[in-house]
Amino acid sequence: MTLKTADVEYIAHLARLAIDSEAIPHYKHDLSRILEFVGQMNKVDTTNIEPMAHPLDAIQRLRPDEVTESDQWRTFQSIAPQVEAGVYLIPKVID
């Protein structure tokens, strides 16, 4: 599919991009090649192909769900500059 100059300008407008008029032929060429490639991919017969969640057929190696650290809430509360009712107080940032 070959794009026209007006197509590139419209795409740039939709994307809120400012493109120099001198660069439009370059973008026209590149975008046309991308669309041709997408067209080639659309022609591939995927009738008996099972959809995949991930392109790599790998299994995630997850660690066992075990507690690895103890609760240090009291320790962190004791060293905080200001605490009230169990929450950390910070200086006012916005008026």
From Swiss-Prot:
Function statement: Allows the formation of correctly charged Asn-tRNA(Asn) or Gln-tRNA(Gln) through the transamidation of misacylated Asp-tRNA(Asn) or Glu-tRNA(Gln) in organisms which lack either or both of asparaginyl-tRNA or glutaminyl-tRNA synthetases. The reaction takes place in the presence of glutamine and ATP through an activated phospho-Asp-tRNA(Asn) or phospho-Glu-tRNA(Gln).
MF (Gene Ontology): asparaginyl-tRNA synthase (glutamine-hydrolyzing) activity; ATP binding; glutaminyl-tRNA synthase (glutamine-hydrolyzing) activity
Reaction it catalyzes: L-glutamyl-tRNA(Gln) + L-glutamine + ATP + H2O = L-glutaminyl-tRNA(Gln) + L-glutamate + ADP + phosphate + H(+); L-aspartyl-tRNA(Asn) + L-glutamine + ATP + H2O = L-asparaginyl-tRNA(Asn) + L-glutamate + ADP + phosphate + 2 H(+)
Protein name, entry field: Aspartyl/glutamyl-tRNA(Asn/Gln) amidotransferase subunit C
Similarity comment text for this entry: Belongs to the GatC family.
Listed EC numbers: 6.3.5.-
Gene: gatC
GO biological process: glutaminyl-tRNAGln biosynthesis via transamidation; regulation of translational fidelity; translation
InterPro entries: Asp/Glu-ADT_sf_sub_c, GatC
Species of the source: Nitrosococcus oceani (strain ATCC 19707 / BCRC 17464 / JCM 30415 / NCIMB 11848 / C-107)
